[in-house]
Amino acid sequence: IYSEDFVDRLAAGEWTFEIPSGKKIDNEVDAAVQLYNLYIVAPALGMDFSQYFTPEEANWFAMLLDAEDYVQKGPGFVGSDISHRNSRPLLDDFFASIDRQSAEHPDGSATLRFAHAETLIPFEALIKAPGSQTQITASDLDFWKATDWRGASQGRMAANVQWDVFANDQGQQVVRMLSLIHISE
């Protein structure tokens, strides 16, 4: 899909491109990452990009994007919560909604929220949901061996975090949380 001349000019620094998001493509690796981004959405587009990546290359790029999402949105590095502390207001609102719904609708109700992976991934890290519990150190160079976090599971389409609230006759409540991110289609 990329000509040899195109790749050589990128590698030599002769060409750079800016994509609509504002990111720059400065070299052949940046161009390959953009091609891989097409590869991972290609099935939804009805296209086959497998001719451009061997399974080993696809796994390497998957790990690269997983590591980026893990550090930027997920559990991140040991001793730091910067990647997911912004989810705290959402967690606080979950609890406030439970209190409000219980008071206003004691016989039952529901609060539904719909969000993208950019919201769900940090939230799962904050509550230490399965797959989002392990933080890594800067010396953990093999990301996939250091953690079980995988973007294909944690940030998947139709992921779900469900809280069911049950109350006994005395009004004591218990919350059951179901994290449905590892369901198979």
Q: For each predicted feature, which ranges?
A:
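Signature for phosphate-centric chemistry
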Residues: 1-111, 115-184
